Amino acid sequence: MKLSLATSVVLLLASAAGAHAAEKATKGPGDYPSRPIRVIVPQAPGGSNDIFARYIGGQLGERLGKTVVIDNRPGAEGMIGTDTVAKAAPDGYTLLMTSTAFVQNPAVIKKLPYDPIKDFDWPAMLGRGSVVIVVGPSLPVNNLKELVALGKAKPNYITMASAGGFMHFVSAMFRSQAGIDATIALYKGGAPALTDIMGGHAHMAVATMVTVNPYLKSGKIKALAVGSPKRLSVLPDIPTAAEAGLPYEASIWWAWSTAAGTPAPILNKLNTEIAEILKLPETQKRFAAEAAEVEIKKPAEIKEMVKADLVKWDKVARDAKMQKQ
């Protein structure tokens, strides 16, 4: 049977398309990854998010035999980078370095370009770091009880330095739970905030251990308590807030997320590989150097944690009368 030229072309194209589809089908989740993986960090280089993303990314790349590229996309309280991942293909090749700010933004931002629950899956938890309550030389207190007593005796006397975002939330949470009236002064970063505390222009701060550690070493500020459930190995002599008489607990966590709909085999592969990385003594030492600890969770456990934290930080914002912008 003779075929027309047009019919022959159609059949040839159909055959090629079928072959391409078959080839694509063979490169499913079982072959993941078959190309480089991109991890978007929604903050500038140099912070804890960037530090941990680069370390884990480097280790993961070695284990998988594929390059893991770190792509910093700062801006708009992390929403630019976060939205990029929310709208990416759910194939495991675009990941998001996520932290506690992810669950705090919905409490203070009226309209997010993404849904924090519906638009994301969670392949891996990385770790957690504590906050530290620190004071400068201008505040005549030696422990947490004295700080709270001073705050109650002198309403609006104490100035809390904050870099906004996570630091603002944990500061507002401390102020509310301590039952004191204190002014929260906003700075353009943790460094200028702590510099002002050392200079006596602000009195105290509630910040991550990663942020305050260099300043504690200088001896110009002192730690009164930590916000973790147990004492920190890097500050063994500093009590927890609960030990010091205030049931205050706050921490920053880090995890990797992907666009919703990422196949379970890919999520599970990433979860398994990263869990093995987190178990390594050298990884735990790297986290400890930033005053943090590794934490391993399954994808479903991370999602439940995110849901619970959304409720928690929304309550903190409402109690502190933080306005949505």
Predicted regions and their residues:
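Short hydrophobic/charged patches on amphipathic alpha-helices used for structural packing
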Residues: 82, 145-148, 194, 213
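C-terminal lobe and pocket-closing loops
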Residues: 28, 128, 142, 212-280, ...
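An extracytoplasmic/periplasmic, membrane-proximal ligand-sensing/linker region
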Residues: 28, 34-36, 264-325
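Bacterial N-terminal signal peptides
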Residues: 6-16
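N-terminal (or domain-start) structured segment
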Residues: 21-119, 156-157, 166-167, 179-204, ...
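Hinge/capping helix and adjacent helix->loop/strand transition within the periplasmic-binding protein
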Residues: 87-92, 107-192, 243, 253-286
